From Swiss-Prot:
Giant hemoglobin is composed of four heme-containing chains (AI to AIV), and two linker chains (AV and AVI). The keyword Cell division does not apply. PROSITE patterns: GLOBIN. Residues 2-144 form the Globin domain. The keyword Iron applies. This is Giant hemoglobin AIII chain. It comes from the Eukaryota. PANTHER family: BLR2807 PROTEIN, GEO09476P1. Heme b binds at H95. One of its GO terms (cellular component) is hemoglobin complex. It holds the Pfam family Globin. Keywords: Heme, Iron, Metal-binding, Oxygen transport, Transport. Belongs to the globin family.
Length: 144
């Protein structure tokens, strides 16, 4: 699958519907992180500084908001590759010392896709476009 111009536009549109249409963003983030930690309980250890042990704390909720804000920016930049690559390099520098495995990025990708599908409905969700475009984003954050 590719993250070409049409896929990028579709992902941007579906993300705007799931994340940016007045839905409760905190609830959306809670849905995603609940699934991340259900699928990869050991990932909580990566979030000790922001209370990954309890996703209901203000510290973790603030972190979840920052993560979704960063993802929102990356998705918005999907059709501006030069600026996207600069943003991904910045995120890569923030994540390189954190010890996040490729498998853990996959869990986050899957949880984000579940969250978007949950919000917009399975009949319109384009899994192939999301997989390809999230691979571009997480690959960039991993420095690939």
């Amino acid at each position: 699958y590719e993250c070409g111009p049409l896929q990028r536009l579709k992902v941007k549109r579906q993300w705007a519907e799931a994340y940016g249409s007045g839905n409760d963003r905190e609830e959306f983030g809670h849905f995603i992180w609940t699934h991340v930690f259900k699928d990869a309980p050991s990932a909580r250890d990566l979030f000790k500084r922001v209370r990954g042990d309890n996703i209901h704390t203000p510290a973790f909720r603030a972190h979840a908001t920052r993560v979704l804000g960063g993802l929102d920016m990356c998705i918005a930049l999907l059709d501006d590759e030069g600026v996207l690559n600069t943003q991904l390099a910045h995120l890569a520098s923030q994540h390189s010392s954190r010890g996040v495995s490729a498998a853990q990025y996959d869990v986050v990708e899957h949880s984000v896709m579940m969250g978007v599908e949950h919000e917009i409905g399975q009949n319109v969700f384009d899994k192939d476009a999301w997989q390809a475009c999230l691979d571009v984003i997480t690959g960039g954050i991993q420095g690939n």
